[in-house]
């Protein structure tokens, strides 16, 4: 996987609370077993009408956000069923980071396992991001994973975030769980050589 050290991107603002996994990826699209293609149906029922026409008022249909790698959402994102497909859809669409003031635990773990960084911020900082993007849709955020800081480049406001040390190392090195173990192989072998049974 690609290493994640820093990211600067415009953001997609979705100031809706309690977005559940069925809204992220409706159940009728869960039949596929490959992770690819799920991005096409991310927020499907909000993006398209019953005739499959794009709903112009929905934020993902605004061309100004086509290159955005950061999704900013309301509180309690990813609640509902534990479907990993929700994380697949977000990753396949191209998002690298999701920011909220609270995530459902299972979604948060699924996101990290699919190399999407879920970052928890204060309600105050979240509101400031939405306000900045409302004033200027080209507002960018910089995610500094090494120092665990989010920088709102429009206002220069900073917010520290917390991340599990193991997951942080995986993101910084582009490792999944297997890659992490393989990287430690020499230490494991050294331990086995020196271990007295």
UniProtKB/Swiss-Prot annotation:
Question: What Gene3D superfamilies does the annotation carry?
Answer: Aconitase, domain 4 (3.20.19.10)
Q: Which reaction does it catalyse?
A: (2R,3S)-3-isopropylmalate = (2S)-2-isopropylmalate
Task: Please provide the record's keywords in A-Z order.
Answer: Amino-acid biosynthesis, Branched-chain amino acid biosynthesis, Leucine biosynthesis, Lyase
Under the heading Pfam families, the entry gives: Aconitase_C (PF00694)
Biological process terms from the Gene Ontology for this record are: L-leucine biosynthetic process
| Source organism superkingdom | Bacteria
Q: In which pathway does it act?
A: Amino-acid biosynthesis; L-leucine biosynthesis; L-leucine from 3-methyl-2-oxobutanoate: step 2/4
Record HAMAP family: LeuD_type1
Q: Which family does it belong to?
A: Belongs to the LeuD family. LeuD type 1 subfamily.
Q: What is this protein called?
A: 3-isopropylmalate dehydratase small subunit
Which organism does this record belong to? Azobacteroides pseudotrichonymphae genomovar. CFP2
Lineage from the top down?
A: Bacteria, Pseudomonadati, Bacteroidota, Bacteroidia, Bacteroidales
């Amino acid at each position: 996987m690609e290493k994640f050290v820093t990211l600067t991107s415009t953001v997609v603002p979705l100031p809706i609370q309690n977005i559940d996994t069925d809204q992220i990826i409706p159940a009728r699209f869960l039949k596929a077993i490959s992770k690819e293609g799920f991005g096409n149906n991310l927020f499907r029922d909000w993006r398209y009408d019953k005739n499959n026409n794009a709903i112009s008022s929905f934020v993902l249909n605004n061309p100004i956000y086509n290159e955005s790698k950061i999704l900013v959402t309301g509180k309690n994102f990813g609640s509902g069923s534990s479907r990993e497909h929700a994380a697949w859809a977000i990753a396949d669409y191209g998002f690298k980071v999701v920011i909220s003031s609270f995530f459902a635990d299972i979604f948060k773990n699924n996101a990290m396992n699919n190399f999407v960084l879920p970052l928890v911020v204060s309600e105050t900082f979240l509101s400031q991001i939405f306000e900045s993007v409302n004033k200027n849709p080209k507002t960018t955020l910089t995610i500094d994973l090494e120092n665990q800081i989010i920088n709102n480049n429009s206002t220069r406001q900073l917010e520290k975030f917390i991340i599990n040390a193991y997951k942080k190392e995986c993101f910084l090195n582009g490792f999944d769980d297997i890659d992490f173990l393989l990287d430690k192989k020499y230490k494991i072998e050294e331990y086995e050589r020196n271990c007295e049974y």
